[in-house]
Swiss-Prot record:
UniProt-listed Gene3D superfamilies: 1.20.1280.50, Ribonuclease Inhibitor
Domain (FBD): residue spans on this chain: 358-410
Keyword Repeat: yes
Repeat positions for LRR: 57-82, 87-115, 137-164, 165-190, 211-236, 243-271, 293-318, 319-344
Tagged with keyword Heme: no
InterPro entries the record matches: F-box-like_dom_sf (IPR036047), F-box_AtFBL13-like (IPR053781), F-box_dom (IPR001810), FBD (IPR006566), FBL13/AtMIF1-like (IPR050232), LRR_dom_sf (IPR032675), LRR_FXL15/At3g58940/PEG3-like (IPR055411)
Alphabetically ordered keywords of this record: Leucine-rich repeat, Repeat
Domain F-box: 1-47
Highest taxon in the source lineage: Eukaryota
Protein name: Putative F-box/FBD/LRR-repeat protein At4g00315
Gene Ontology biological process terms in this record: negative regulation of long-day photoperiodism, flowering; regulation of short-day photoperiodism, flowering
């Protein structure tokens, strides 16, 4: 008799829960005792994005039977990653049935759907999904139609991810969010024509919000009423022609309508349009800020009275030629800044052009934060061959009086001789405290 036969079923099910679902199912061939143990698994994951036609023929039946035969009192997590339509035998009706079974019979707590289809229309989900009392996490990705009924209530939903889905009408998203009374984390990604013009987020309980928009999605405007928000990330990489000339702040076709966000602590902006005043008006009280502005004009950010008194951490992307202008304005406006990092977003377009005299013309006097508060300075991928970047680095190393650590990374493509020359030049510029640790990589 093998030792596993002496273990209780509860322990064996726990062991199976660490395996991928397809491997857990294979254990049913071991013996009669193992035959149905996998049906007690609290988490089910089906990833069939890469299967042959012959494999796809029995796939729909297998998933249906496994959900019908599921024995656990509740499904903690159900994940479906499927590729169907032109090949295989999975149909939209199958998806509809599986979601219905998970919602009706299994009190699912986390549901994740990623559908890559060849169908003419996105897949419609059952109305019962939008009335599920047990679901806490809902993730919908790709070819899915968010068709929200008039009567909708998700009393337990705390996390919602909507990635590149299609909405049945203009009000679908607003109707959905308005009936999630405890929602805390929301992610909306858009990169297609999805029937959504105005992006309206009115959720009193929301604490984290991530919005990502890229071509060719259309957007008339953003309306936000999120008084409990602590973290905000907005990525808008559409071109101006895709945004209906949103740079015109008086344009009626594109607007921002933000209510106060008194609890906001952290913001992350990746923006490629000029009219960003509305964003900064509501983030002046944050503690952590990350910025990448693909199109920058002085009047778009800096105006009388803009001060970040509580800002302690600043990350700024150096991918654009005018980034140092933005940095100088922020240093002047952030008297209590403690951490500064310059970086480049991975896979981000490089728009840098060397403007050697740009930095020297920006600051009339040393910003207060350099004299009294900045403790950490980090620069990832510093292109020392660009004189503008060398000027910025030398200025900070020369004037940061309270610095505790400075770390600068050069591109790996630089020759050792080139790196050594840059390190020597930067080292000679350093006039910070003797206790400061300076690292070059």
């Amino acid at each position: 008799m093998d030792k596993t036969s002496q273990l209780p079923d509860e322990l064996l099910v726990k062991v199976l829960s660490f395996l991928p679902t397809k491997d857990a199912v294979r254990t049913s061939l071991l013996s009669m005792r193992w035959k149905s143990l996998w049906m007690w698994l609290p988490k089910l994951e089906y990833d069939f994005r890469h299967y042959s036609v012959s494999e796809g023929q029995g796939l729909a039946r297998f998933i249906t039977l496994s959900l019908l035969g599921h024995k656990a009192p509740a499904i903690e997590s159900l994940s479906l990653k499927l590729r169907y339509g032109a090949i295989g035998s999975i149909k939209p009706e199958d998806i509809y049935l599986w979601v219905s079974l998970a919602v009706h019979d299994s009190n699912v707590r986390e549901l994740s759907l990623k559908l890559c289809t060849f169908a003419e229309r996105p897949t419609k989900l059952p109305k019962s999904l939008y009335k599920c009392k047990s679901i806490v996490i809902l993730k919908l990705k790709d070819e899915i139609l968010v068709d929200v009924p008039r009567k909708v209530c998700l009393p337990s939903l705390k996390t919602l991810f909507l990635g590149r889905v299609t909405y049945s009408d203009e009000d679908s998203l607003h109707r959905l969010l308005s009936n999630c009374p405890v929602l805390e984390d929301l992610v909306v990604e858009r990169d297609r024509i999805d029937n959504l013009g105005k992006l309206s987020v009115v959720v009193k309980s929301l604490q984290r919000l991530t919005l990502k928009m890229s071509c060719p999605c259309h957007l008339d405007g953003i309306m936000m009423n999120t008084p409990s928000l602590k973290y905000l990330k907005v990525t808008d990489e559409r071109q101006e022609s895709d945004s209906d000339n949103e740079s015109d702040s008086d344009s009626p076709r594109y607007f921002y309508d933000f209510e106060d966000m008194p609890k906001l602590e952290e913001a992350d902006f990746v923006l490629t349009f000029q009219n960003i005043k509305k964003f900064f008006k509501f983030v002046t009280s944050i503690k952590r800020l990350s910025l990448c502005l693909g199109v920058y004009t002085e009047e778009s950010l800096y105006h009388e009275g803009l001060v970040f008194n509580q800002l302690e951490q600043l990350k700024i992307c150096s991918c654009d030629s005018d980034w140092s202008i933005l940095l100088s304005r922020l240093l002047e406006s952030s008297p209590n800044l403690r951490e500064l990092e310059a970086y480049v977003i991975e896979d981000h377009p490089d728009r840098r052009v060397d403007l050697p005299n740009q930095w020297g013309n920006q600051l009339n006097c040393v910003p207060k934060c350099l004299l009294s508060s900045l403790e950490t300075f980090k620069w990832s991928e510093m292109y020392g061959l660009l004189q503008n970047q060398m000027d910025v680095a030398k200025y900070i190393l020369r004037n940061a009086r309270c610095l505790k650590s400075a770390t600068i990374f050069f591109p790996t493509t630089y020759a050792k001789e080139t790196r050594d020359e840059m390190i020597e030049e930067l080292s000679l510029s350093f006039q910070g405290p003797e206790t400061c640790q300076v690292f070059f990589h």
